C-alpha cells in the first residue's frame, strides 16, 4: 500500500471507530481487552488509555522496557495535539518531507509513529487516546484498531491496514 492508501484507510478507521458514549468503565474495558489480546499472543507491549489528560488504564507486559513508557507518552501527545492517529500524523509528515520539529514541536515530546489512536465520541470528537508500544509501529497501530473494532462490533477485515 502507498502512503496515500494508508492515509485514506486510517481516515476511514477514525470515522468508523467512534463511540456513542465513552466513560471510565469503557476506558478500563478497552485497556483490559488490549491486555488480554497481548497476553494471549505473547506480545511484550505497554498499553495506555487516557481520557483528556487523565490516565485511566496502564499495563506493562513482560518484554516491555522503560523506553516504551516514553514512547507511549510521545505517541499519545501526537493524538491529543492533532486529534488523529499518531501513525496518520507520521505518514503525513513523511509524505510532506517534514518532521515534528518543522511544526514547532519537540521530538522529545512528540513521536509521529504508529500506536496511538484517538478515542472519538460521536458529537464530541476526540476525548482521549488509546496507545500501544512495543511492536513495529504498523503492528502497534493495527492492534489498537483491532481492539476498538472488537469493542464497537465493526468488521476488522475492512478496517485493518494490510
From Swiss-Prot:
Signal peptide: none
Source domain of life: Bacteria
Pfam families: HbpS-like
Transmembrane parts of this sequence: none
Family recorded in the similarity comment: Belongs to the UPF0303 family.
Protein name: UPF0303 protein RL3365
Organism whose genome encodes this protein: Rhizobium johnstonii (strain DSM 114642 / LMG 32736 / 3841)
Lineage, opening ranks: Bacteria, Pseudomonadati, Pseudomonadota, Alphaproteobacteria, Hyphomicrobiales
